[in-house]
Structures are given as C-alpha cells and as structure tokens.
Amino acid sequence: PADAAAGARLSASRCASCHSSSEAIHSTVPLLEGQPKAYFIAQWRAFRERKRTAPVMVTLAAELSEQDVDDLAEHFAALVPPPTAQAAGSDAGRALADRLRCAVCHGPGLKGTSAGAARLAGQKVRYTTWSLQLMRSGTRPHGSAAKPDPLLADLSNAEVESLAAYLASLH
C-alpha cells in the first residue's frame, strides 16, 4: 500500500526544490499538490517510458521504484494546493473553459478526477500556457490524443493565455 508519509519524505528530498509554489522561480514547472493519484502515476510512467522528455524527470523516473512513485502520488493527492497569488481570471477565460467543456474530463471545479484527468485549478499560469500550446500543436499528448488537440487547435495565443489565467485563478 502507498505511504503518504514516505512520499512526503521523498518529496522533501527529491521534488520540492523544483516543484515549489513560487511562480517567479519555477514558472514552467507544475504544482503537484492536489493532483489526482492516477494522473500523477500516469505522468510518471510517461517520463519513465520517454513519452514525456524533461531530462531531469526522465532521469528521476528511472531512479525511483514503483513503491516510491505510489508513495509520492499518495502524498501529493492528499495535499491542498497553495492559494495562488496570480491575477484573477478573466471572463473570456471562463467563457473559453465553458465552451471547451473542460469540466467534462477534468471534473467539477477543474480539480482533476480519480480516472486520471489532471487538476487544472490553481496551476501556474506560465506552465499552463506552455502545456496548452504543446497540446495545441500535438507536441504533448492531451489525454490519449498524440496529435494536435482539436479542442485547442483554433485557439489564438491570446486565448490560450486567457484560459491559463482563468485556470490559475481557481482554487
């Protein structure tokens, strides 16, 4: 069984230096607090299998055991994301989230699901903008799609930024 306390110890020694809540220091590294366990484990496997290619994460994924990953996932899933100090989301960003029906996959309040959808609420603006741009181009899979995401394909950069700001404003 997963051990959240062991995950907390691993997080302190292996994760916290990059995955902090500071937008200024690590704006392109996601917050992990509150991410559903299934999502965390799926992303870890993607790094291990090199379907996602951040060099530090690929190396770390190879070093940690399945038990370590389960412990980390249990730890992060149990945490409440820190309040964001980011600007309030725009009405345009909210309208885009509604139009794209983000909650259908990402759950009520866009807090992720036990089925493995990521928590979008409260995520860093810059990280979310970057991720949406990669999914829009097909560089990063969105769900099971390994091609440009049709939901995001027609969004302008300004719309992507508006959506990211709105998502960051949620808690």
Walk through the language-model features, giving the residues of each:
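Gly/Gly-Pro-rich "capping" loops immediately C-terminal to redox-active cysteine motifs
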Residues: A8, E23-R52, V58-E63, G107-S137, ...
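The canonical Cys-X-X-Cys-His
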Residues: S13-S22, L72, R99-G109, L163, ...
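N-terminal export/targeting leaders of redox proteins
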Residues: P1-A2, R45, E49, A158, ...
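Conserved N-terminal glycine/acidic-rich loop preference
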Residues: L79-G89, A103, G107-V125, H171
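Electrostatic cytochrome c docking/interface patches
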Residues: P1-S11, I25-P30, A77-D98, T113
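Conserved hydrophobic/aromatic "anchor" residues
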Residues: S11, F47, H75-F76, A97, ...
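C-terminal capping alpha-helices of c-type cytochrome domains
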Residues: A62-T84, R126, L151-H171
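Short, tandemly repeated low-complexity microdomains enriched for cysteine and small residues
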Residues: P55-L60, A85-D91, S144-L151
